[in-house]
């Protein structure tokens, strides 16, 4: 049940225009948002009832870490006292979600319940989807090294699913992550693969009596409360790829150059070598060899299939100075890819060809312009400028990036936007359970009533040791 901190109770009738009260709509908006979010319930949420604007830097708290102390009769108090304050980090409020719509005069006589169902519910589902996508979109920041991630890309099956989860559990334990409150968030593909494994569905081996199978949920697996989220990072087949093959065998942990048969790789492109199956990319390309950004995790056979995820072009021609500046938060135009093989929602997208210049995002929305160009919206504003023609975009590899995490790995930080009453506009700001929503209403002559819903937020990585990425 939602607990409202700043709500006023109103009553309205089914066909009463008094139902157009912003406070009532804001309360319903929060209820719908709360019901439709998945990932936001599994992370740290921080809210303060202080009005903020888009782009403001606000302070979030990272839980403090204390050390073991031993006391004797002669121990002085000064050596025992530890700082109990959580460390402070700055978080930009760079996620401004908005849904605006018009209720036409002919619709305004409908009941409040009908108006909510037709207009408000689908908009709040869209905002909930956006919140989950920006949270899951930060999963790449936890990829770490081959030793600190579990599984293989696009190759989870009934034979290795259990071992993958054992590996993820061990990695978190080795990082001293809390053992309580762990969550595993799976893509639909990863869930379907896990359900093929007997150890996840047999009651005697699950440890939960098998009730999860009866309710079509994965339930509690190896210490993880397990969920399927449709917004989990995942790239399906159909990406713009080319194929190559290795020229010899390579041992696990090999970190040198890799010889390819034809070598059409460009620096910066994601390259997946069968047998290794990690989210690797090329940092160097010579006539017949490439160098990857990290050592191989697993051994690679001779003539192993090499999948190259082809770069596409950045088109900033509509921007002043033909550059998407650092901090740019709107749609980015990409083109130059093979017809109908553009970037996908949930796919990684990187810029930069070296470790120093690389910055990586997740695509959270795609709108096609034509068969070879599209608009993409990223999980957060650009960290660095991207220039038209000079910079390439590098779409990520097939497979899923599923976070296995504790609550304090990520934080959703929200602040209320200012109420703006006047000039025919009525506004209400409501908050509950660490989330604030603003609803504004204004009549437009002969047009109807414009309703605008806003939510201002930021996402912070609190502790990289509290999340491991499960590749699937």
Task: Place the predicted regions along the sequence by residue.
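N-terminal "assembly arms/tails" that initiate or stabilize quaternary assembly
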Residues: 2-91, 467
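Short, low-complexity, charged/polar segments at coil/turn and helix-coil boundaries
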Residues: 42-54, 59-69, 159-204
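Short acidic, glycine/tyrosine-flanked loop/strand segments centered on an H-E-D-like triad
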Residues: 85-111
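Hydrophobic, glycine-enriched assembly/anchoring segments
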Residues: 103, 440-472
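Alpha-helical scaffold segments that mediate packing/assembly in large oligomeric complexes
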Residues: 110-177, 188-191, 195, 283, ...
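Autoprocessing Asn-cyclization modules and mimics
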Residues: 156, 200-203, 213-388, 470
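Long, low-complexity, polar/charged, intrinsically disordered or flexibly structured peripheral segments
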Residues: 376, 381-382, 393-414
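A conserved acidic, glycine/proline-rich C-terminal tail/linker
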Residues: 431-440
């Amino acid at each position: 049940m939602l607990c409202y901190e700043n709500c006023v109770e109103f009553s309205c009738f089914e066909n009463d225009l008094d139902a157009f009260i912003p406070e009532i709509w804001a309360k319903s908006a929060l209820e719908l948002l709360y019901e439709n979010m998945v990932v936001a319930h599994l992370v740290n949420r921080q809210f303060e009832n202080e009005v903020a604007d888009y782009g403001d830097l606000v302070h979030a708290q990272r839980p403090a870490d204390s050390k073991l102390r031993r006391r004797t009769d002669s121990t002085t108090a000064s050596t025992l006292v530890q700082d109990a304050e959580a460390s402070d980090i700055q978080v930009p409020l760079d996620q401004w979600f908005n849904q605006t719509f018009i209720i036409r005069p002919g619709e305004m006589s409908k009941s409040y319940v009908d108006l909510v169902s037709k207009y408000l519910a689908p908009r709040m589902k869209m905002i909930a989807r956006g919140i989950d996508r920006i949270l899951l979109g930060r999963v790449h920041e936890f990829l770490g090294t081959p030793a600190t991630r579990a599984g293989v890309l696009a190759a989870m099956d009934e034979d290795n699913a259990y071992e993958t989860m054992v590996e993820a559990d061990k990695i978190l334990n080795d990082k001293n992550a809390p053992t309580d409150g762990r969550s595993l968030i799976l893509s639909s593909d990863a869930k379907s693969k896990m359900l093929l494994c007997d150890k996840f569905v047999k009651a005697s081996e699950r440890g939960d009596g098998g009730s999860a199978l009866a309710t079509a949920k994965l339930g509690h697996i190896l210490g993880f409360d397990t969920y399927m989220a449709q917004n989990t990072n995942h790239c399906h087949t159909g990406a713009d790829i080319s194929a190559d093959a290795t020229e010899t065998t390579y041992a696990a942990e090999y970190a040198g150059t890799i010889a390819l048969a034809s070598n059409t790789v460009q620096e910066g492109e994601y390259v997946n070598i069968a047998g290794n199956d990690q989210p690797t990319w090329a940092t160097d390309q010579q006539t017949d060899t490439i160098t990857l950004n990290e050592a191989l995790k697993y051994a690679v056979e001779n003539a192993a299939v090499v999948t190259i995820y082809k770069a596409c072009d950045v088109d900033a021609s509509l921007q002043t100075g033909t550059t998407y500046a650092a901090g740019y938060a709107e749609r980015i135009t990409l083109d130059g890819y093979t017809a109908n093989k553009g970037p996908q929602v949930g796919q990684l997208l990187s810029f930069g060809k070296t470790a120093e210049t690389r910055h990586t995002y997740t695509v959270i929305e795609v709108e096609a312009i034509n068969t070879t160009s599209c608009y993409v919206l990223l999980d957060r504003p650009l960290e660095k400028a991207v220039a038209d023609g000079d910079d390439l975009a590098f779409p990520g590899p097939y497979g899923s990036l599923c976070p296995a995490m504790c609550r304090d790995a990520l934080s959703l930080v929200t602040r209320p936007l200012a109420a703006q009453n006047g000039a025919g506009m009525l506004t209400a700001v409501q908050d509950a359970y660490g989330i604030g929503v603003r609803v504004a209403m204004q009549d437009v002559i002969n047009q109807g009533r414009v309703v605008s819903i806003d939510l201002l937020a930021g996402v912070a990585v609190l502790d990289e040791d509290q999340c491991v990425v499960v590749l699937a």
